[in-house]
Amino acid sequence: MELKLTKYTAGVVQTNIYFLKNTETGECVILDPGANASKIIEIAEKQLKAQPVAVLLTHGHFDHIMAAREVAEHFGVKIYALEAERELLGDPQMNLSASFGMEICITKFVPVQDGEHLDFLDLDWQVIATPGHTGGSCCYYIGKTGAEPILFSGDTLFRESYGRTDFPTGSERLLLAGIQGKLLVLPENTKVYPGHEGETTIENEKKYNPAAFLGRLC
């Protein structure tokens, strides 16, 4: 199997939107479509010539969900998010869209749970709940790709940094515990694709991410 990963960065806070395509089947998954639905659709249809089969959300902040409904409706696919994020997804104040003069909410989605396995692109996607940035934040881990494992970490784990916890439902204690106990125990060659800025590896984060050390104090 050959996979093609495409990143498109958009929106007021430069959110990374990911497309993972199985080049053999032509299917793709779109993660965190946070802005510019028309461009996301164009990338999938014209640039990648792919057929999206799902929209996955790592959490419910507006900069990760703003284009989700339009993209999902256009392709006739479902949105997936952690059940624990339901309240935040449906509340413009909590998901911060109201702070930018918008009222964005998502009430229709397929709820997933910690440890659940999803089957897309002939791959096993493991849902890893990582509350902290928000109460219903999660990551998606693909252990068997034919190459290095992949982790889509949302705003939980960044390159040598980690997500803010001063927004509604945030908790630094939970965030650090989740990073150390669930993410940094993954294989060191795992490629990490975060919600903002550049990619990294678990090996790098075990060495240089402050969360690797702060978590031991919580």
Across the structure, where does each feature detected by a protein language model lie?
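Conserved beta-strand hairpin/beta-sheet module of binuclear metal-dependent hydrolase folds
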Residues: E2-L48, C139-S153
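Short, glycine/acidic-enriched loop or turn micro-motifs at the edges of active sites
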Residues: E24-T25, A35, F62, G136, ...
